Amino acid sequence: MPRTRLKIHVAEPFDFSRLNGGESDLLGWTAQASPAFSDWVVHLDRPAVVGEEEFDKVKISSRYAGETVSKLLEGFGFTAINICYPRRDEDGRTYWHFGMVGNVLLAPEGQ
């Protein structure tokens, strides 16, 4: 699948930009930009931090029931999303932790 460039604006947690060099936007790519996928894993161009945890990918899903992230591909400017990042439990297993909300849009050319 081709890679689709995305720009994710993190609206909450409110101090996200403070922890990430003044930036509240994440840039990255996904190979899952298709209606076939309800959630998209986005590989970030640079790592991000929430609390004391650093991560280099996030999983995004639609914020509202009945909507899909793929509506972004149908000409909508942006869509509201839930944002999860990977964490490890006490047994060392990785899971997706819901910790942020925001919006996603197709990244402008050159970003």
Label each residue range with its predicted role.
Residues D91-Q111:
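OB-fold/S1-family single-stranded nucleic acid-binding modules
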Residues L6, G21-A33:
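Structural detector for short beta-strands of small beta-barrel domains
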Residues N20-D25, R63, T79:
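Amphipathic hydrophobic-ligand
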Residues E53-V69:
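Beta-strand/loop nucleic-acid-binding surfaces
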Residues P13, W29-F55, T79-D91:
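Basic/aromatic-rich interaction segments and small domains that mediate binding to polyanionic partners
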Residues E67-I81:
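Short nucleic-acid-contacting surface segments enriched for D/E, G, S/T with interspersed K/R
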Residues H9-A11, H43-D45, S61-R63, C84, ...:
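A structural detector for beta-sheet-dominated domains
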